[in-house]
């Protein structure tokens, strides 16, 4: 009986594991191997150069700046997305008026969830078209038009949101490492938050609906207000869901390639204002001025994979609950 069950499980696992090995692990192995060579990506002939490409990453000013941009995204994007999603999920599920029937959500909450979730079903290309119209650097842009009508911006000098290279936090240097947050990069983060809040709102909302209403009613009877109920009751019970969301958003923050290409002029924006690790990797893949550009890009790809794995491990370690709360 056990042998038959083992064969059954093995048979079902064989195909997906084989596909994972062929299409995920093997390409990673090839990328690591090519990163140790001077391959052009087009010729089978190449020489072994060791970790030369990896050492060069530490002197690549654009790549180091791109890492800084990913750090800014990693700091702002997950935090604001989770906070906004948690706030609206709480208000939609427990933000209604309490009555004899107990704690209720906001009337028409399903409609609000649909509205919030709608950006999630749009492709990145459509999102880019919409927000390029919003950020357009003349009075025809939606945001500029509003600011001009309010008298906050001169009609003759509209703001070029996606072309602004000035940093909102100045420029912080740590040796060769540069940390800055150009206005154009902040604009991309806002777009990413807008597109992601809906999904996590639905995720947190579903988790809140699984919490018995008796718990919230008991907190209300004990004199807890909505703020105390959220921080002392709701949030601890959603700890695992927030941890998962944090990991997914952290991984997404290390990518951002589609938004960079879709929204900013050129790959990486003006003066590399929106350059991220993935966009600089793609730019270096087929540089005509460097014969081993493909090998150098492979080194970037491997470094991004390592950073992503370390980040996911650290986030899971930090946010993992030591004891599981049950209800």
Whereabouts are the PLM-identified features?
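A structural signal for multi-pass alpha-helical bundles of membrane permease subunits
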Residues: 2-327
